[in-house]
Amino acid sequence: MAVVLSVIIPVLNKADTIVGEVENWLESGVAGEVIVADGGSIDATADLARVAGAGVVTALRGRGSQMAAGAKTAVGDWLLFIHADTRLEPGWQMVTERFMADAANRFCAGHYRFVLDDTSPEARRLERMVAWRCQTFGLPYGDQGLLISNEFYEHLGGFPSIPLMEDVALVRRIAKHRLKALPADALTSAVRYHRDGYILRPARNLLCLGLYFLGVRPAFLVLLYTRGRE
């Protein structure tokens, strides 16, 4: 029996790009379904996603809540959670199919290599830092994608409904020895780093991560994370 992959994308006001994203996933030959988890868009994101062929669910704003809602409706044996501003580069299909076909990965999860669509030295330095973080601490973030069997996801209890650090919370439950780095690139938009800076944004992310590990509530962390932004 063929393995079915459900791609789950949390979105908010992505009407300008959602059609192309959905079509790319559906045309990949790997995704059996695409689920757009909308966090209350005030534009035409949801309607356009449906027209493009995606299933659409609505949820409270926040990637944790949105991805959890998407997973509840997924019919796939495997789930791929991935951010709307991330796309997987050529070669990911074979890598993903091999991972899903290996019975040893039934209770494991995979993530892809973090790559920015920026040719600057600062971008390359950040990519190396992310690779080190993943290798040393087993902490991939959501913009690297998370490939996990539906069974294992349910066993872990899924994404928590928290406004920040939902990806960290889940991968900590997966545990480092069950996380595998997949040899395919996840190309992510560098817009956030151009806006916030290649020093300030990673520093703020690291501060939030450290405070989270110290027990600070995500409801407070999200205020720190979004400070100074609209």
Predicted regions and their residues:
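Short aromatic/hydrophobic "clamp" motif used to bind/position activated sugar donors
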Residues: 79
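Conserved donor NDP-sugar-binding/catalytic core segment of glycosyltransferases
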Residues: 91-122
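Hydrophobic helical membrane-anchoring modules
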Residues: 172-230
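A conserved acidic beta->alpha catalytic loop
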Residues: 38-46, 86
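Acidic helix N-cap motif at the loop->helix transition within catalytic regions
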Residues: 16-20, 43-52, 91
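Glycine-rich, basic loop-to-helix element that forms the pyrophosphate-binding segment
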Residues: 58-74
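Cell-envelope/extracellular polymer assembly enzymes that use nucleotide-activated donors
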Residues: 4-6, 33, 169
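Short, well-formed alpha-helical segments that are part of the catalytic scaffolds
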Residues: 8, 13-27
